[in-house]
Amino acid sequence: MKSDEVLFNEAKALHIKGKVKNAQEIYLQLLKKNSNNSNLLFLLGTTYVQQKNYQKGKEYLNISIKINSNFAESYNGRGVIFAEEGEYRNAIKDYDKAISLKKDYFDANLNKAVALRNISEFNESIKHFEICIKLNPNDSKIYNNLGNLCKNLKKYNTAKKYYTESIRLNKNNAEAYNNRGELLQIHFNEFEKAIQDFDNASKINKDLDYIKGKKLHAKMSLHDWNSYNGELKIIKNEIKNKKKTIYPFAHMSLIDDPGQQKTITELYLENNRSIPLKQIIKSTNNKIIIGYFSAEFHNHAVMHLMLDVFKNHNKSEFKIYGFSIGPKKDEWTEKVKGYFDEFIDVSHISDTEIKSLSKKLKLDIAINLTGHTLNARNSIFFNQIAPKQVNYLGYPGTMGSKFYDYIIADKIVIPEENRKYFSEEVIYLPNCYQANQEKIEISNKNSNKKDFGLPKNKFIFGCFNNSYKITPLIFKSWMNILKRCENSILWLLQDNKLAKLNLWEEAKKLGINKDRILFAERLPVKEHLKRVKFIDLFLDTFPYNAHTTASEAIRAGVPILTLKGKSFPSRVASSILTNVGLEKLIFSNLEDYETEAISLAKNYKEIESLKKHLTQDKNLSKLFDSKAFTKDLEKIYKKIIS
């Protein structure tokens, strides 16, 4: 019979090799005779944590601490559980206790640094990462985490350096490849390099959270559809199995399923569910105090849409604050500052400091204009910074969190029967949910089709939506339309050279010559709006419609042909068209969509009639009367706090 010491050493060896279940069985066997061994209890608790059985893990770690209150490892282990459950403050308390017992405890310092980063205590987080570097300068994990921190601080070049150093120190660090890939994809638009990093990460750990969705979304930006169907099928299966496989925003552009959207968004935020909601007493402010939180107070679609709302607010009834959480500042930032009672850059202060500031300013309503999009900082709202918290405009879907009281929409983008797919209470505007400027300056420079590389006597189909919105199915539909309309071309927005080449190759496979697909470079807003008018018919994408690009087309007098689906993002163009009296351009299947596009291209008088319709102010007033829109929005705010 083996001695307890031999069994214990065997169990530890199995544990180190990753055979957690086998090690656990031996630990349990040993515990029967060694019930007061705090180290054994710690190791046993750790096996449960590794199997995500946090309740059982915490139970054994609590016993370990009770037996030996000076056992640093058990405090650190329990801290890990708290962090996994989203209880970062409790986690930090345990890490602090572990460090007080064992000053040079690397794991506890590293875990504390990560927890501090997760609650946006960035400066304190940096201090503990620096301690970790001193303790272990060759540890790949530290540099990976420093990369994450710099990404949070919007220091993207520095973040890239840290991820690269992490990979240099450990070629098998899947997380570092994954994180660098995401950085390259989102902040550098280096999609090819991002895909390579995602591939490297997958080879090391094929079950890494969200890796499959990130890779497919990056490939969509390049129109790389070679394995599209197979990859999408895997993602759909993993969603059914409640796996973290795709981010909510990426899901929107691929799958038209609002129920599934709610499920994956709630899964994405599951660590924040355990944070207790606190009842905030309604304020007694003389004015209703609104805080608009956005990463887009610069030259961005959300800024273009919201500018007149900020300008038109009734300052005798409302006090409005702009909270900037994004890294970019430009002339649009300077322009909008003057419309707020106060404009505050909070991009480099902690969530706790933002909560204190919000409390000091006595916010009645906090509006999230960014949602689950680029540079989001939704952790701010988990601190409940106002009595009422609202999801509006920046993200066309549910936030998937009980921390939001309302989503502002209209009855087309969220019909009554779809309210169940939103964690927020849906509150409706009477017309289109989308804010718009009443007038936008358009370049007065004389220009013609030739100036933009367009043929003079061809029918111009156009779509200026982002590349990732173009799916193989919708592109095939467009090629079917071009086949039937020989005297036509398709005008698209060029995001990168490889995307253009891939799209030409796809067109060739479908029997369309590349000279019938033309690309436009990105231009400043004034010049961009000038060229939009040369489109004869805007062909919309599906399942992620044109949103800002749709209202831009309408403003330029260009009719839009759209497909209406079930999800919010697949119904936005339908809402816009309904509000300008062009419901006849809304379709629910590709066959009818194609038929109508072909019919219109062969009947230019009808196109002229549609364009004339869009030049009449009476048809556009619902969409572009920003003063009336702001009054409707203010009625909602009053209702929210009543």
Question: Which positions does each model-derived feature cover?
Answer:
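Alpha-helical solenoid repeat scaffolds of the TPR/TPR-like class and their adjacent stem/linker regions
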Residues: 1-454, 466, 476, 505-512, ...
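Charged active-site motifs of nucleotide-sugar-dependent glycosyltransferases
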Residues: 286-289, 455-461, 488-489
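A conserved nucleotide-sugar
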Residues: 317-319, 479-509, 514
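Short Ser/Thr-rich beta->loop micro-motif in glycosyltransferases that lines
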Residues: 370, 540-546, 564
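Substrate-binding clefts and catalytic carboxylate motifs of secreted carbohydrate-active enzymes
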Residues: 462-473
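Donor-sugar nucleotide-binding helix/loop cap in glycosyltransferases
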Residues: 539, 553
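Short alpha-helix at the nucleotide-sugar/activated-sugar donor binding site of glycosyltransferases
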Residues: 554-555, 578
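Short acidic/histidine- and often glycine-rich active-site loop of Leloir-type glycosyltransferases
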Residues: 570-581
